[in-house]
Amino acid sequence: MKLFILAVGHKMPGWIASGFDEYTKRMPPELRIELREIKPELRSGGRSAESVMAAERQKIEAALPKGARLVALDERGRDWTTMQLAQALPGWQQDGRDVAFVIGGADGLDPELKARADVLLRISSMTLPHGMVRVLLAEQLYRAWSITQNHPYHRA
């Protein structure tokens, strides 16, 4: 099984890439994280947020691995603790399907994409920069894996 992070956005600051890479390189070979950046749509010429999100949805769908479990990150999603993520991870691994976490653009994710998600997940109640969400998600995935392995990284 592979973990994919599909993120609308590109040209992130160096510290975002460094933070993200720090956690992805810690993951074991059987649970690699792959980042797929989706070029954001321009919201110019009076273009509505809805049309931007719909265009980004098409790009996201084109980048989704076939048959992957879809976890859409959204401010209205369910709150999971780190332990809940750690409990979900082994089941996902046994299932064998890849898991794709999707981070939307500035306007969020298209409602159609959210409706078909297997899980609608909120990463925080606070509004965060999308680049920071990449780092937080990679860290939480590493932490969840470390919990399943009784690794000393997680000490709560």
From Swiss-Prot:
Record flagged with keyword Phosphoprotein: no
Record field: catalytic activity: pseudouridine(1915) in 23S rRNA + S-adenosyl-L-methionine = N(3)-methylpseudouridine(1915) in 23S rRNA + S-adenosyl-L-homocysteine + H(+)
GO molecular function, a single term: rRNA (pseudouridine-N3-)-methyltransferase activity
CDD domains on file: RlmH-like
Taxonomic superkingdom: Bacteria
InterPro entries: Alpha/beta_knot_MTases, RlmH-like, tRNA_m1G_MTases_N
Record-annotated membrane-spanning stretches: none
Matching Gene3D superfamilies: 3.40.1280.10
Keyword Zinc: no
Protein location: Cytoplasm
Listed EC numbers: 2.1.1.177
Cross-referenced NCBIfam families: PRK00103.1-4, tRNA_RlmH_YbeA
Function (record text): Specifically methylates the pseudouridine at position 1915 (m3Psi1915) in 23S rRNA.
Subunit note: Homodimer.
Name by which UniProt lists this protein: Ribosomal RNA large subunit methyltransferase H
The organism of origin for this protein: Burkholderia cenocepacia (strain ATCC BAA-245 / DSM 16553 / LMG 16656 / NCTC 13227 / J2315 / CF5610)
Gene behind the chain: rlmH
